[in-house]
């Protein structure tokens, strides 16, 4: 544990004061108050999440106190602020000590706490660190969703920092990610229909958060497994990013800017993709139908050859059709986990291939695989493309 005392009153130390301003500028404000929406805060006990719950607790406390017309101090109602801690149990007593530490903070701040104990996985505490980062993230995500619904929370606040953003984007880049991955972590994203994940510290450096905690004497826990470079994220954090920063000191800020610009581009493509879905497709049950006649009339061969005709050419652009297809997958609840960029490009090629459009009632899903890759209408997750009455139909088998 880093530090040795807990703060008892709001602190005006320079770094902490800047962090308080930062949280106010990024947290949603409804009618002049940020504390009107019930919020669940994820806290591991590490520095970033400890800083987040302390900052939000101060914000809630400030907004709960005010003056009435007689200039008397009164307490104003605020929405619930709930802390959630997921105990994976992977580090034995250390994991339990993390839980006890988070409970201590919540007791001092008088915040309700909900804890999830994860059942033992196939990787026990004695068999070394768990390397399946995706599984651990999904466990936490599912827990946060359940806890938010249980406590009526609209927002789930998590403590991703600017360093997390840079590490994520580098990880995505070396894996050959698409445009969505190059945008990195979003400041807000949907967890469920009525639940939004918010990341108010996404523009704050990790060292800045630690400096602020030191100024106010607030301790935090250090997870020894964060040093294990068996985790790709830790390898990027401890080896790759420091090497980059040794040559480019402002690399984290530059990567963050690049992600912001990519996000803006993605939003433009998404809007075009939604227009494409509305104009050329229909959904019925587990079927997605692409009306080729509509697409053909809007993008004739003459218009396709005219590069200056941007009003029509966007309809056949691969990024737009890929984005539209991904939206369709999400709308139908189909998993995109095994869909690679090669799959999306193949689907786009079939959609744009007019020779497929005029193949009457022939299932194009019976193609042969070449070099282990199906070049026809079969896609991961049991999704099949066929031609029915000159329409392209995708369905779950």
From Swiss-Prot:
PANTHER family: TRNA(ILE)-LYSIDINE SYNTHASE-RELATED (PTHR43033:SF1). It is an enzyme of class 6 (ligase). The N-terminal region contains the highly conserved SGGXDS motif, predicted to be a P-loop motif involved in ATP binding. Pfam families: ATP_bind_3 (PF01171). InterPro entries: Rossmann-like_a/b/a_fold (IPR014729), TilS/TtcA_N (IPR011063), tRNA_Ile_lys_synt (IPR012094), tRNA_Ile_lys_synt_N (IPR012795). This is tRNA(Ile)-lysidine synthase. The keyword Ribonucleoprotein does not apply. NCBIfam families: lysidine_TilS_N. It is found in: Cytoplasm. Keywords: ATP-binding, Cytoplasm, Ligase, Nucleotide-binding, tRNA processing. Coiled coil: none annotated. GO terms for cellular component: cytoplasm.
């Amino acid at each position: 544990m880093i530090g040795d005392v807990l703060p008892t009153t709001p602190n005006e130390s320079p770094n902490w004061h800047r962090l308080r301003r930062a949280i106010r500028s990024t947290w949603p404000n409804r009618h002049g108050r940020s504390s009107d929406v019930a919020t669940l805060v994820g806290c591991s006990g590490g520095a970033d999440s400890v800083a987040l719950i302390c900052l939000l607790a101060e914000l809630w406390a400030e907004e709960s106190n005010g003056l009435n017309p007689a200039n008397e101090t009164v307490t104003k109602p605020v929405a619930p602020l709930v802390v959630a801690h997921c105990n994976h149990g992977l580090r034995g007593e250390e994991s339990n000590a993390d839980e006890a530490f988070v409970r201590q903070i919540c007791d001092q701040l008088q915040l309700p706490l909900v804890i999830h104990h994860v059942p033992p996985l196939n990787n026990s505490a004695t068999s070394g660190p768990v390397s399946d980062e995706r599984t651990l993230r999904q466990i936490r995500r599912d827990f946060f969703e359940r806890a938010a619904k249980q406590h009526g929370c609209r927002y789930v606040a998590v403590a991703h920092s600017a360093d997390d953003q840079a590490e994520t984007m580098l990880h995505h880049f070396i894996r050959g990610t698409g445009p969505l991955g190059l945008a990195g972590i979003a400041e807000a994203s949907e967890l469920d229909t009525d639940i939004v994940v918010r990341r108010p510290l996404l523009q704050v450096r990790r060292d800045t958060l630690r400096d602020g905690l030191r100024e106010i004497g607030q301790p935090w826990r250090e997870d020894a497994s964060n040093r294990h470079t068996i985790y790709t994220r830790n390898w990027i954090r401890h080896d790759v990013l420091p090497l980059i920063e040794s040559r480019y000191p402002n690399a984290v800020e530059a990567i963050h800017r690049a992600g912001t610009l990519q996000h803006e581009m993605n939003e433009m493509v998404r809007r075009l993709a939604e227009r494409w879905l509305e104009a050329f497709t229909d959904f019925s049950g587990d079927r997605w139908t692409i009306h080729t006649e509509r697409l053909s009339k809007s993008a004739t061969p003459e218009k396709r050859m005219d590069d200056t005709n941007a009003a029509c050419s966007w309809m056949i652009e691969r990024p737009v059709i890929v984005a539209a297809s991904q939206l369709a997958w999400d709308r139908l609840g189909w998993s995109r986990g095994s869909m690679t960029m090669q799959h999306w490009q193949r689907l786009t090629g079939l959609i744009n291939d007019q020779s497929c459009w005029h193949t009457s009632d022939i299932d194009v899903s019976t193609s042969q695989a070449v070099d282990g890759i199906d070049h026809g209408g079969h896609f991961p997750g049991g999704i099949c493309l066929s031609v029915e009455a000159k329409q392209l139909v995708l369905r779950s088998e």
